[in-house]
């Protein structure tokens, strides 16, 4: 959910435009030989970026990205509630992206009005539809419900369903697709004590007739505001649905005043989303550790191995499961120097045992200081790490910095309750092309650059660098190094 600060900034733009030590942690790794090209995306439909016209700028944040099985990348980002959602497509391995029509408005304007435009997520079908395309689905938060927009022609047109959630009063929707026409949306229901529901459609988003509760009868205590939702994933081979989250560790902790969300969970459905069984990925014995930062993340590789990535506000860990989420490996640390702090992770899995992970990282570290209170000297980058043997205990991640500096100073991770700097908002993403194996990262940046590939938009000046006036959604596409497919 976006804060009033985000809405105020959008209004201004419209006017201008008219870890615990009780378990073993693997920290071995190596510097990766990867290369990335970076550029800003456009906001006007039909604009291809990068270009030499100085019109590749936008004011969007909290982006998402996916790749279809043909190697096309699709991405979305938000302009804030009532501002609408922006979408892009790349057909050349992420070297260029074209701005599509907004998924939740028929308007051709770059800043059209829409009740949606809050939290956004994106999914692509795993099988072709009758038109020879992979359906593309974009979820957009409108608070009263979740908008789900479907494109059956490769992003050319969209069909909008404004009732993608069956339970009203929603927050933080996630979306995942399976087969040619199944799509599921998960979300927090604020009116139902922050319960997590998964609503599914079997007709490409036209109707959402099936709703399941992510909490099984033995874990209903995870509701009652004792959890924080993570993303949703579907294994296209066995059709299992996986909902990630953080929460308390046991029913007895519902009355514990000093217990944080020190456990990571995965809700598993083997019946298409009708029912779920909740499995503990990791429960830290230190109840003061907090994993409820944006966001616990789950991904599934082609062999059905599952990876869950999570941050304790300073370091980044992953656990894997080779038995469909029933049992889990001990957590292993991913980040290494110079990323002394690692937050807001996202992952994508490819071939068996192959995993890419991205996060916002800085060389600054202070164990007693949250990133929200980091000094102005703390420089943040997008970090990229890859493990080609991620189901092997003790295996190494190769790590590199994928972007220029994207932010200085504090980074708030408390969503709408933020009192500090929220320019990076809550999440970003990475996808990998099944045809090349290489990654394309979509991320937020609040720096004034004004270069050919990152021109300054209206209102973004050198004096406003590192503020929300310069917020934009950018791309970092991998151009060399190993990939994760096949």
Feature-to-residue mapping (PLM):
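C-terminal PAP-associated
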Residues: 27-486
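Sec-dependent, cleavable N-terminal signal peptides
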Residues: 1-30
């Amino acid at each position: 959910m976006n804060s009033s600060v985000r809405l105020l900034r959008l209004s201004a733009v419209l006017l201008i435009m008219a870890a615990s030590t009780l378990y073993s942690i693997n920290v071995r790794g190596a510097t990766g030989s990867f290369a990335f090209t970076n550029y800003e995306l456009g906001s006007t439909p039909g604009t291809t970026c990068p270009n030499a016209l100085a019109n590749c700028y936008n004011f969007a944040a909290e982006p998402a990205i996916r790749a279809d099985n043909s190697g096309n990348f699709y991405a979305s980002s938000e302009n804030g509630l009532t501002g609408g959602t922006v979408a892009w497509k790349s057909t050349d391995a992420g070297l260029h992206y074209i701005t599509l029509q907004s998924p939740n408005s028929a308007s051709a304007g770059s800043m059209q009005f829409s009740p949606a435009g809050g939290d956004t997520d994106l999914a692509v079908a795993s099988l072709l539809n009758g038109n020879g395309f992979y359906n593309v689905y974009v979820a957009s938060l409108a608070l009263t419900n979740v908008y789900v927009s479907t494109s059956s022609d490769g992003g050319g047109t969209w069909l909008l369903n404004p009732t993608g959630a069956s339970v009203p009063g929603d927050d933080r929707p996630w979306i995942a697709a399976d087969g040619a026409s199944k799509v599921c949306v998960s979300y927090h229901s604020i009116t139902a004590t922050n319960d997590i529901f998964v609503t599914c459609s079997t007709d490409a988003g036209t109707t959402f007739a099936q709703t399941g509760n992510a909490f099984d009868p033995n874990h209903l205590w995870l509701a009652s505001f004792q959890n924080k939702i993570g993303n949703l994933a579907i294994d296209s081979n066995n059709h299992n649905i996986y909902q990630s989250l953080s929460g308390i560790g046991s029913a007895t902790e519902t009355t514990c005043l000093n217990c944080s969300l020190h456990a990571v969970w995965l809700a598993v459905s083997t019946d298409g989303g009708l029912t779920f069984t909740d499995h503990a990925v990791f429960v830290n014995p230190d109840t003061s550790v907090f994993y409820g930062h944006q966001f616990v993340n789950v991904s599934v590789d082609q062999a059905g191995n599952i990876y869950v990535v999570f941050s304790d506000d300073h370091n980044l860990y992953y656990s894997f499961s080779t038995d469909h989420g029933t049992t889990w490996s001990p957590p292993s640390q991913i980040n290494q120097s110079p990323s002394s702090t690692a937050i807001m992770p996202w992952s994508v899995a490819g071939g068996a045992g192959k995993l890419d992970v991205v996060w916002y990282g800085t060389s600054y570290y202070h164990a007693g200081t949250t990133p929200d209170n980091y000094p102005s000297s703390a420089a943040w980058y997008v970090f990229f790490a890859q493990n080609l043997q991620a189901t092997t205990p003790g295996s190494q991640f190769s790590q590199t910095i994928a972007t220029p500096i994207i932010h200085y100073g504090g980074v708030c991770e408390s969503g709408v309750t933020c009192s500090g700097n929220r320019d990076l908002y809550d999440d970003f993403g990475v996808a990998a092309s099944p045809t090349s194996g290489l990654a394309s990262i979509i991320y937020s940046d609040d720096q004034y650059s004004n270069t050919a590939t990152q021109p300054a938009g209206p209102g973004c000046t050198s004096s406003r660098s590192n503020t929300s006036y310069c917020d934009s959604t950018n791309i970092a596409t991998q151009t060399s190094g190993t990939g994760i497919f096949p």
